[in-house]
């Protein structure tokens, strides 16, 4: 028997970008939720400064494991398509450091740790104005 309306919340911490069909998956999860329940999604943000800085070396792309890539506008369209409301967006401040360090390693950079920390800091500083942090947490309501 398929369960319906049995959960108050479902979390997807850096999961959605790995799924072959995000629309199908979100619709499936939505059926599992009670009314006015939440899906919490954390995903890399392709509109972040660290992405524009690193380009093809940006670790947030994580090809081929990441099947999809989102910025806030694309994620909002996805949510509209499946009938979910974005209730809030929360920055993941530490992801810019982690992703930048990995991106420096992708570039085979000398002092990748120090350079990554610096670019991660700059990314967060710029995101204070743009709200485009390296990764974002979306709280969705059905």
Predicted regions and their residues:
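Conserved SAM-binding loop
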Residues: 1-54, 69-84, 135-142
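Short glycine/proline- and charge-enriched loop/turn segments
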Residues: 54-63, 102-109
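A C-terminal cap/extension of S-adenosyl-L-methionine-dependent methyltransferases
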Residues: 88-142
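Conserved glycine-rich, hydrophobic/aromatic-active-site segments
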Residues: 66
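Short, flexible, glycine/charge-rich loop motifs used to bind or transfer phosphoryl groups or to couple energy/partner
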Residues: 1-2, 56-58, 127-128
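Active/binding-pocket-proximal capping segment
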Residues: 57, 84, 92-93
